[in-house]
Amino acid sequence: MRIGLTYDLREDYLQRGFSEEETAEFDSPETITGLEEALGALGHDTVRIGSIHDLTKRLSRGERWDMVFNIAEGLRGFAREAQVPALLEAFDIPYVFSDPLVLSLALHKGMAKRVVRDNGLPTPDFALVETPDDIARVKLPYPLFCKPVAEGTSKGIGKSSKVENTAALKRTCLELLARHNQPVLVETYLPGREFTVGIIGTGADAHVLGVLEVSLNQGAESGIYSYHNKEHYESLVTYTLSRGKAETAAAKVALKAWRVLGCRDGGRVDIRLDDHGHAHFLEVNPLAGLHPIRSDLVILARQAGLNHTTLIGMILDAAIKRHGMQSLTTAGPAYLPREVGQTAQPRGQEALTP
């Protein structure tokens, strides 16, 4: 199969004068090379397309592909992740990962939480601060947690994100409003363990790949999976693929949220426990990072015994099945689905019971 790759390369934007933080969600050359190598190992030919601007030019020249593996994040607005999928749909080109509606919904964390909450799933109580006047209207008990409503890679999350009083809330919200030019999500701070849940598939076919606990080491910014902690994860963060009662509860909430939000093919759901040990939905990442070494989903898969190529094959197989296309992956299906709370294992490898 001839597969096009759409992406935003971080170094291109840095050369244009954007900051390290502004480009934090964009991809490295290693990510693109890793995708090429994985898809090549699965028997496919790949074509580097690039950003939406490159895609527009190539479509206008009449270029087409059997499938597009889209990891483009976009640059501006709540619909930035939806731009490439919308263009591909206009040209009737199949692509990997979620559709424009889901990507826009998931990027706006407040909207996603409303959908999850309205479907009966637990998520921390929250308020949206769109203007400085909204700060006084926040009536939630402290401590609270503040973050930009539509950023990824923990952008905008730091030491001041956890607030203990009204003065700190005002200070943090004003800083985030000015710095990120978007609303601030203010939610009840949950003091318990934090997990990220890997999911493969769509709808009824979706299943949990594994549950990865995120633990902060000595020297890390305390109590939060911040931008600083994530950027220096090698020394500040410990990731542990774990199984137990809490992990099973986290997996169930995550899988239900994934299905309710309409996410497709593969990604992550972040879960945190409250002071009673109950699992709550924090946010979903339907366009998860795929760096072959350091991305959370890849780390999770590796600890589950799956290499990068197998993970990419699983995601691609899910997209092929969803599109009703004949599977052209030479390696065939790369996984065996398992029940919630269990880890998907490659063929020939026994699954472990939590």
Label for each model-derived stretch:
Residues M1-V96, L101, L105-L107, E130-A136, ...:
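ATP-binding N-terminal substructure of ATP-dependent carboxylate-amine bond-forming enzymes
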Residues M1-Y7, S60-G62, S104-L185, P191-R193, ...:
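Active-site nucleotide/adenylate-binding loops and adjacent lid/helix of ATP-dependent enzymes
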Residues D12-R16, G152-S154, A220, H291-P292:
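Short acidic/His/Gly/Ser-rich catalytic and metal-binding motifs that mark active-site loops
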Residues S19-A24, G158-K162, V298-L300:
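Short glycine-enriched, charge-decorated loop/helix-capping segments at active-site entrances
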Residues T46, P94-Y95, T123, L144, ...:
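Hydrophobic beta-strand scaffold residues
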Residues R117-G120, R243-P354:
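ATP-dependent carboxylate activation and anion-phosphoryl transfer catalytic cores
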Residues N165-K245, A249-K252, L273-H280:
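Phosphate-binding site of ATP-dependent enzymes
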